[in-house]
């Protein structure tokens, strides 16, 4: 057996290059008190793989995995073509072939024991060869360990032959014994199945009786075969049911996964070959779960749910075994986690963030007093995004004294209430249980900041030489984000959201009133509409008018101003739009698309979401000689534009290590981390300025509604227009609480239903909102 070189099983300290040492509590993920035991990871690098791990399974205390390895020189034959791209044939009409010796990466199967030793090639398996002269690929789509150390491998072949114009696809089931001898093979291809279709097998499992189950996702069925490949029967799902996967329970029974009919979550069904139907649902996983699989350790299934690694015994409640990130493991890198018979959590991962390579990680339960303690800072969030996850991992690996422990409240979401986690987090903060660091997505920061729960970050920015004080940042954005001169959160990217219109009609200076918008519309051709097709009154109110609702509330002083006339104007603006839009009567051809409507004067304004510069010059070209002005939303102060962002990072006023917390959250302002701009325009001034400099004069290629390729140039005038609007924008969207939004929407419905005037609705909102806002102080 070909032994693969591996490193020793090491507990790597923070001072080593990978810096992957950590401890994570075996109690509920995110618990702040030190638990009696923590998981300590031991890393084994898997050498000899040409790439990362692709598939992983477990059975009988061993792990099976697939990865690519470098093959020796292979003689490949290819169809030869002439200079015009036509296939060459000989005098007999046969294809002329050419030969080439190449080295390729090919799929291979490996096994290793759960203790981390004995990584070895499963020598019996080598990828199937395509027919001679064929061009295509062979994919190792699934593997399943069998009783006694055997293996079932499922390959998908896709290829074409020179003498044929048809593209062939088939699936090949191959069965091996523990010594690697191939004992059976069966091909499923066109003509081998009912209806002549080639099945699309995408998952495989095996039961205690030695039966192998193949999931045909396209055909909506699960096919059972015996150890020789002979068909035993099939179970079909109904037409409305989509098969997601298979797994084998601890008792050796096979279960199928399907989406919950009511949406969200995964249902688990026993497979009943006798009735040829899926059995009743035996358990339902949360909509947060990433599919179940055979995970070992006496559990029926394991799965990931957000940052949590979970295990399930059918008939009992799922167990959250650990949080990947609190073990300093990037959940995005985990191929699969397993549980050993001794209770250790194992995972196979591909190290994308470090030096590369694949690893087996054993997370060993260890008494907490045997692990070097660190001071912990808590970070709370409702979903952990990729950038923050990566920053937490980097901080924890490099800092010898402090670590950040993540509490992801999305774990409390349910199929009945997707917002349960956010509600719990918001309630806890309101009650005074504030984390050291907060990811602010969805959090009513206006009311919490007014209560003094979070720290002003301007002093930290001014004292940080890395950024050059306030001048080192895009100040208009952060000034708009500030409350009464205090900045409570920072972020690495933002979007400029505005309306664009023809300069010849709306003028050249951004910012206008509702009356000015109506006057401009009167100048447009008869029948011209304000926005693109499909907008209704309620949609305009929810998506456009709501952008500046936060400006009607002063949370600190408990003052509302919905009754000043501006809010009533906002409601009356929606009268320009229909109650309902009749999509059945619409023309969806390019001639009725937004671009054609703007060019022909049938649409006055275009919504702009400027989070990059790539398409701006194309958008401007739509208005032709009339020119384009970023006029903004009516009634919004300043430029009429608003800033939006996906969420920020804040520090609690109660945090005892604010400087350490700042060292962490300020990663989002660092120039090196803003090259990708966090999904928007960068907030670091140097990166922001460079973005504009680099794009001036650049040719941009776009595609029109009718598919035509259009090339435009981003000019200095375009750059100046965007920057001028940014410099005069003073509003950030979405700055209101969910409860306040509900009050506004409830009262506004009376206006949309024709039961109340705009002024009546404004007065009612003023009364209810004032009571609510003062209750929150």
Which residues are covered by each model-predicted region?
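Helix-loop-helix "hinge/cap" segment bordering the ligand-binding cleft or interdomain interface
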Residues: 177-179, 183, 462, 482-588, ...
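Conserved N-terminal structural module of periplasmic/extracytoplasmic solute-binding proteins
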Residues: 25-75, 82-101, 110, 114-116, ...
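C-terminal motif of bacterial Sec signal peptides marking the signal peptidase cleavage site
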Residues: 20-23
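C-terminal capping/gating helix-and-loop segments adjacent to ligand/active sites or protein-protein/ligand interfaces
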Residues: 643, 702-769, 773
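Hinge/lid segment of periplasmic solute-binding proteins
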Residues: 443-498, 515, 627-634
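Mature extracytoplasmic/periplasmic domains
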Residues: 229, 319, 332-333, 345, ...
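Extracytoplasmic/periplasmic substrate-binding proteins
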Residues: 572-663
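Extracytoplasmic "Venus flytrap"/periplasmic binding protein-like
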Residues: 403-472, 597-605, 620-623
